[in-house]
Amino acid sequence: MAFEFPAAYRFADSHEYAHLDGELIRVGISAFAVDQLGDIVFVDLPDVGASLDKGTSFGSVESVKAVEDMYAPIAGEVVERNEAVLASPEELQNDPHGAGWLLVVRPSDPAQLETLLDSATYSAKVNAG
């Protein structure tokens, strides 16, 4: 199965995405990661106001297969979290790049986006294996 990813998104090697939306960054996990996890049963996210450091764990996602940490693709402050995903984890499964987003972050250094993989590079990486 070949995965397609939104062209404007940037991706971490650990499969989280960052999407610039005005001055804020929408964060989630890729459709590839969701597919690898299987049926998602629980999502744990930080509270609004929490500080994220790039590359450090910010929460976890639990599926029937495993519990996996999620890592911040960018540093900043959490300004919103997706309560719908917390209440119904299947939202993440159904639309990871849309309604299944996880956090909105006010970045401390927006230039960190440039350190992430562009959509084409990430797509080639996950579709090659």
Swiss-Prot record:
Q: Does the keyword Transmembrane apply?
A: no
Q: Which SUPFAM superfamilies match?
A: Single hybrid motif
GO BP, one annotated term: glycine decarboxylation via glycine cleavage system
GO CC, sorted alphabetically, is: cytosol; glycine cleavage complex
Write down a Pfam family by its short name.
GCV_H
This protein's superkingdom? Bacteria
Domain Lipoyl-binding, first and last residues per copy: 24-106
Q: Please give the cofactor(s) recorded in the UniProt entry for this protein.
A: (R)-lipoate
Record-linked InterPro entries: 2-oxoA_DH_lipoyl-BS, Biotin_lipoyl, GCV_H, GCV_H/Fam206, GCV_H_sub, Single_hybrid_motif
- Give all N6-lipoyllysine modified positions: 65
- Keyword terms of this UniProt record: Lipoyl
Q: How does the cofactor bind to this protein, according to its record?
A: Binds 1 lipoyl cofactor covalently.
Query: What is the role of the protein in this entry?
Result: The glycine cleavage system catalyzes the degradation of glycine. The H protein shuttles the methylamine group of glycine from the P protein to the T protein.
Family statement drawn from the similarity comment of this UniProt entry: Belongs to the GcvH family.
Enumerate the PANTHER family for this protein.
GLYCINE CLEAVAGE SYSTEM H PROTEIN, GLYCINE CLEAVAGE SYSTEM H PROTEIN-RELATED
Subunit annotation:
The glycine cleavage system is composed of four proteins: P, T, L and H.
Instruction: Identify this protein by name.
Output: Glycine cleavage system H protein
What species is this protein from? Synechococcus sp. (strain CC9902)
- Gene that encodes it: gcvH
